[in-house]
Every structure is written in C-alpha cells, then in structure tokens.
Amino acid sequence: MLQLGSQPHETFAKLSKKYGPLMSIHLGSLYTVIVSSPEMAKEIMHKYGQVFSGRTIAQAVHACDHDKISMGFLPVGAEWRDMRKICKEQMFSHQSMEDSQNLRKQKLQQLLDYTQKCSEEGRGIDIREAAFITTLNLMSATLFSMQATEFDSKVTMEFKEIIEGVASIVGVPNFADYFPILRPFDPQGVKRRADVYFGRLLGLIEGYLNERIEFRKANPNAPKKDDFLETLVDALDAKDYKLKTEHLTHLMLDLFVGGSETSTTEIEWIMWELVASPEKMAKVKAELKSVMGGEKVVDESMMPRLPYLQAVVKESMRLHPPGPLLLPRKAESDQVVNGYLIPKGTQVLINAWAMGRDSSLWKNPDSFEPERFLDQKIDFKGTDYELIPFGSGRRVCPGMPLANRILHTVTATLVHNFDWKLERPEANDAHKGVLFGFAVRRAVPLKIVPIKA
C-alpha cells in the first residue's frame, strides 16, 4: 500500500501499462481489481452491472449508520430503488430542474456581485473558496429555497469546515479499511472524527427538513416552493414509497458533500486551465458574448448554443475527473470478465483518470485541447466509457443533471464578465501537486484577480 504513493490513480495507471487494463492487487487484506480501459469499464458497469453493483464500505461511512441508509452505499434493493426513483423522476427530472432555475440564477448574481467588489478593490479571489460558496448556495437554493452561506462570513467557514471534514475523512486512505483487525482500535481516529462531522451535518439537514414538515402541517393551503425539499416531504407522505425521514436526511448529506466537493474542485480546475491558456479563454469569451450579448448572468437555456463552453468543461473533466477512481464497487458473486475470474467480495476500482490520459484514446492526452470535443460526439453522461467522471450504469451519480448546470453556469458567469490574471505570476506551475481525497484538488489554491472586462 505504501508503495502506491500519494497519488494512487497515477500509480495504477503506470502499472496498467505493464499488467493490462484489468489487473489485481492486494491492498492489505483487501483483494482489489483495477479497471483501466473503456472496454473493461463497460464490462464491469454495463454488461455485468448487477454483479458489480455492490459497494465496499469504508470505516468512515459507518458513522451515524450512513452505510445502512445512504443511497450511495445501500445494496441494490427496494429502499435503494425508491430513493433512486425520487432522484430520477422528481428531484433531478428535467421539469424539476427547469422549475428551480430562477433560484440558481439569483445565486449566480451574488457571485457576480462579489467578484465585481473584488475587482473594484483590486484583490484576488481564492477560486476554490468562491466556487465552494457559490456551489453550496446553488445547491441550497435548489434543495431548500434558502442560502446556506455568504461570502466573507464566519458561518461560511464553519459550514465549509463540516463539508470538507466529511469529504476528507471519507476520501483519505485508512489502514483499518485494509486490515480489518485494526477496526476496533480505530488507530487513525477516522471513525471518531467521522461520527462528529456526519452528526453535525445531519443535524443541520434534519433541522431544515423538520422545519418544512412543521410548516406544511401548520399551513396546509400555503403554495408549495419550487425546491427539492417539497418533493422529499411529498415522498414521506406518499404510499408508494417506503421511506423514513432518515433516508431523506442521509440522501441530502450525500448530495451536499458529493455535489459541493466535486463541483468546487472541478470549477477550480476549469478556471486554472483557462487562465493558463489565454487563447482558449478568448474563444470562450467570444462565444459567450455572441450568445449572451449584454446579459450578465447566463440563462441555463443558453447552454445548447455554447458548444465551446461545453467542450471546455468536458476537457477539464477528462484531465481532472474529481473522483479519479470513482466510488469503489464490489463483486456480489463470482464473475469471469475477459477470461479472468473476479471472486465474490472483490473490490473493483474504475480508473477514470487513466482512461482520460490514455494516448491510445486521445491525441496529446496531457494537453488542454477543448477543440477535440467539437469534432467528437462524446459526453460524460455514462454511455461513452472513455469519459465517465460521474460513473455509469445503475450506480451513475444521481446529481449529474444539477452538477452539469452548476459547472457550466458558474464558469460562464466568471469568464463572461471579467478578464483574469494570476495574483502571483510565479504561481503558474500546474504541477505544484495535488491532494488526493474524496476529490483530487490542487495542493496550492488558485488565486486570481478579476479585471472588469
């Protein structure tokens, strides 16, 4: 395990060149198979998707019984199907996303106002922090019709600490996960810290949910809000769903942590790539100007008319998938794949990062070239296996429709209204390191100065 280094996805990619796209390795006592090609990924996630629909459960995920309630970790069964159905048909349906669009537009205006203020003061912006606040507010507006955080506030830092606390504990390697004999001793304190962070976040979410339930009881004739919380309260009352309040609070935790951490990380990578490539930045700005005209905040309906912006987001996802190994899967029974037996209980990791950097799939794989997606009809929605940052099959990320809108609209708002320069020009080295965790982010935060365009 120690030989994998701090960037296991890169180490696995190098090993796959020697041992092939389907290779096995022992991580402690945990037998693991690494998948590094689109063909093998399709076998695992599509052809044998039911066999590999299980999850290996990290010790941290046992906090507050999250593993027994979370849609992300529940086995495929009645409860999982009910939550999946709510996400697909109601929470993230096209109509639901359209209904909540104006709520998100208000939060984009707040980002614009904050960036304008920084521009007038001549101060740089920590893009990760600004993206985190905006993403969290976009999600809060969509989920709860409320604002969770504000720019430059103490409450924001506290909320950020909780979210990043949960994400870091879930994402950081824990020896007790690979040597089960250590679990009762919790040598790294992972379970103890996870209980604290999970408990704090679940407490906040339960408060929002219970407040809405009580409001609905006290005001049965009040008009419903265009947010996901109304959908969840309706689901609790519906006889065709067998869900309890805790199912919905843990679902919201998954959406908050998964959505905010991955979207924040990806926005930072997108802005880094554009600032480092002035000619690409100029192309995006020109396209946005031609479509948006005098509008300051992009409307989500404009997205189909912004192919180069879409290509930029895809190219960033190819180079920097936020979860490079996706969430681990587990074989629920013995299965032969490509002539190799994968025994029941095997952990399976899909190396999305390796596929995005494979020279047999991509020309100049390490270069930021959005133009490649103008000529190829490839998308990241789970059917093109060379580009699967959100996963694929029955375990594909349920929040992808919202994340897709967030990535495009935040990027458009920042790029259309401002020119950008590095706060410290000497900090233009893209290889200063990354931090591996729930999402792989830059080790050195991107700080850039907005200049009124």
From Swiss-Prot:
GO terms for cellular component: membrane. This is Ferruginol synthase. One of its GO terms (molecular function) is heme binding. The lineage of its organism: Eukaryota, Viridiplantae, Streptophyta, Embryophyta, Tracheophyta. Belongs to the cytochrome P450 family. Its EC number is 1.14.14.175, 1.14.14.-, 1.14.14.60. Pathway: Secondary metabolite biosynthesis; terpenoid biosynthesis. It catalyses: abieta-8,11,13-triene + reduced [NADPH--hemoprotein reductase] + O2 = ferruginol + oxidized [NADPH--hemoprotein reductase] + H2O + H(+); ferruginol + reduced [NADPH--hemoprotein reductase] + O2 = 11-hydroxyferruginol + oxidized [NADPH--hemoprotein reductase] + H2O + H(+); miltiradiene + 2 reduced [NADPH--hemoprotein reductase] + 2 O2 = 11-oxomiltiradiene + 2 oxidized [NADPH--hemoprotein reductase] + 3 H2O + 2 H(+). InterPro entries: Cyt_P450 (IPR001128), Cyt_P450_CS (IPR017972), Cyt_P450_E_grp-I (IPR002401), Cyt_P450_sf (IPR036396). CDD domains: CYP76-like. The chain crosses the membrane at residues 15-35. It is an enzyme of class 1 (oxidoreductase). It is a single-pass membrane protein. Its cofactor is heme.
